[in-house]
């Protein structure tokens, strides 16, 4: 049935404060009556037995004549009043909406008066039997009714609704009440997380939980949030990645592990970045980065089919194909492909790339930047946004991949990939560096970069080096940004659209 707008024709055009005052007056009347009857103003004894969407599905193929010609089907529903026209109402629960038919001849006068006084947003319980209108709409013929929660603030209506984007983010609860599209987005998010968890569990991965506060920030190149532990009198860092702890677990014998949890990076906010975000990280012993590319293809294709029913996923004006295999190309070749004036010699020439970075890209080149760092900058600035269809970029420079295993044929690159869709990085994975001596040297190089002014360079983690010295089996690991993946599946333009409560600048009180 067509879903009515959140709109009332019975309420006069009053200010919000006037409407709130009216509702408080109604609550006072309810409280006064409750004192006489001994009933609770906020009852909590009703037990719902049916959901709106389940009833719509159950009776979708049963016409009016069949419903009226058979034994009555009695139901008990509950939800928020979204429309009240006197003779019928519409309530909304977590699954959808259903009409309630108000039989003026069959209900007591005081019940009819209470129904008439209901405001949009009130939460009610209803009992009755199923019927179908002449227009074909399914309804519950009301026989019993109870007000469960009195709403003291008016809902946005059709013309003055919750259209301000910032208001949607600040008052997500209200956005969820009035916008079906918003509810659908977060249902998709839940399906994505559940689908990933089920896929990996079926592959014999074990879900684990690792610390959210770290003594040393590690596992990624980013600025951390800093806090203080009063009892231990020491600085701690909100984690930027769980990687080093998860690899410790592989050392300990848990050969397939994953964690779905929050990471925190004290960096900028944009349509693609939020300082607090959700990641899935997983590690598999006796596998390499190519195995994880295959796993990623299989998992994303299954998610698309299970959630959307297709591997052709619309996003804005584009359609992304989640049907594997996905394109795979090295960073070196991708730079050449998208910079036709470059030669292979140019891409391997530090001085050429430094001049291009400064003069064309207008990016600062610090003295410590090596060839790999400059290649990465050129790739990020000239290639990334052009990677529209699902694409694996492979063979990242060792200089910018301090935790990845060096390639056997070329020690200047690593067995690493990043995965892109719509010009955005969604995943990062690689064959893990399990040589503790090489890892220690790379940590030392990162410390030198940090001392030279690179705030995102990594710290030296002696405990992790000690763990590697006990022996990490050949392992591959990967992280996928849940928020960005949900953006694609939900066709959401901003990362804030897929976060229930995104961080906002504090308003003046």
Curated annotation (Swiss-Prot):
InterPro entries: Aa-tRNA-synt_II, aa-tRNA-synth_II, aa-tRNA-synth_II/BPL/LPL, Lys-tRNA-ligase_II, Lys-tRNA-ligase_II_N, Lys-tRNA-synth_II_C, NA-bd_OB-fold, NA-bd_OB_tRNA. Mg(2+) 1 binds at residues 418, 425. One of its GO terms (molecular function) is ATP binding. GO terms for cellular component: cytosol. Its cofactor is Mg(2+). Keywords: Aminoacyl-tRNA synthetase, ATP-binding, Cytoplasm, Ligase, Magnesium, Metal-binding, Nucleotide-binding, Protein biosynthesis. This is Lysine--tRNA ligase. It comes from Acinetobacter baylyi (strain ATCC 33305 / BD413 / ADP1).
